[in-house]
Swiss-Prot record:
Enzyme type, top EC level: ligase
Disulfide bonds: none
Localisation per UniProt entry: Cytoplasm
A single MF term (Gene Ontology): ATP binding
Gene responsible for this protein: pheS
GO biological process: phenylalanyl-tRNA aminoacylation
Name of the molecule in the record: Phenylalanine--tRNA ligase alpha subunit
Length: 327
């Protein structure tokens, strides 16, 4: 192998002449590839006596290693040149102002809850909360809801077993509050509730706000005046409002409240009524001495009406394009 040293010298010279990584790779293939000059030297070993082959093979491998080291060194140098050139072209002016972080915003339903809490807080209402996993007594029995009522059915309610369920309303908190304290009582109860329903205007989980007053000489007139003031404050306009007779097991008389929409049609916004005497008796309050009114409304429903949202499900999809409109 008299010309092995010459091949190594030519390879090193070619390595130094390569001006970029692509050209350098061509040199590697030419000398160290499967059919490269140095690789083919291994085929000449068969012409040597067996006892000379190990030494000759070691010489060839040493030559290949020298060329590989030269390739590695040249590649590192070329990549360094490219990196330095790119860094020079991407010089950052550190005197420029930093990139400002975008401020977040409250979810529209949270805005609605906060707005309602503020209004009723100014009227002396306190905010109460309670468990979302409820028992049938607080969710149904104490509220004068009979055993055969459709709300108890499996297709409407998420039951864990025969006595425990995901609450279908926040009214259970009213029961707990009336049992824990004597009148006068003035509370609102915001929270998540669960019903087995899902379409454009219903979701299995939604937010509800209920209100309750219990005191002496509370009348339906007090209820109407409170809700008139609330709705006009919430929608920020002098709305046309009507009360329709309705039925709820826990209030008597009961009503549903509508507001006149911009399209000239009535829109239902909440339900209300005077607390049923049986409910007061169930919590140990004498209905001959005290009376009260209660109301309940869906937060998503009010938010849809306030902001003109047509699909309830948009509130739960976390689409920033939608949510940024409410910042």
């Amino acid at each position: 192998m008299p010309h092995l040293a010459e091949l190594v010298a030519k390879a090193k010279a070619a390595v130094e002449d390569a001006q970029d990584v692509a050209a350098l790779d061509l040199v590697r293939v030419e000398y160290l590839g499967k059919k490269g000059h140095l690789t083919l030297q291994m085929t000449s070993l068969r012409e040597l006596p067996a006892e000379e082959r190990p030494a000759a093979g070691a010489v060839i491998n040493q030559a290949k290693q020298e060329v590989q080291e030269a390739l590695n060194a040249r590649k590192e140098k070329l990549e360094s040149v490219v990196l330095n050139a790119r860094l020079a072209a991407e010089t950052i002016d550190v005197s420029l102002p930093g990139r400002r972080m975008e401020n977040g915003g409250l979810h529209p339903v949270t805005r609605t809850i906060d707005r309602i809490e503020t209004f009723f807080g100014e009227l002396g209402f306190s905010v109460e909360s309670g468990p979302e996993i409820e028992d049938d007594y607080h969710n149904f029995d104490a509220l004068n809801i009979p055993a055969h009522h459709p709300a108890r059915a499996d297709h409407d309610t998420f039951w864990f077993d025969t006595t425990r369920l995901l609450r279908t309303q926040t009214s259970g908190v009213q029961i707990r509050t009336m049992k824990a304290q004597q009148p006068p009582i003035r509370i609102i109860v915001p929270g998540r509730v669960y019903r087995n329903d899902y379409d454009q205007t219903h979701t299995p989980m939604f937010h509800q706000m209920e209100g309750l007053i219990v005191d002496k000489d509370i009348s339906f007139t007090n209820l109407k005046g409170t809700l008139h003031d609330f709705l006009r404050n919430f929608f920020e306009e002098d709305l046309q409002i009507r009360f329709r007779p309705s039925y709820f097991p826990f209030t008597e008389p009961s009503a549903e409240v509508d507001v006149m929409g911009k399209n000239g049609k009535w829109l239902e916004v909440l339900g209300c009524g005077m607390v049923h005497p049986n409910v007061l008796r169930n919590v140990g309050i004498d209905p001959e001495v005290y009376s009260g009114f209660a109301f309940g409304m869906g937060m998503e429903r009010l938010t849809m009406l306030r902001y003109g949202v047509t699909d309830l499900r948009a509130f739960f999809e976390n689409d920033l394009r939608f949510l940024k409109q409410f910042k």
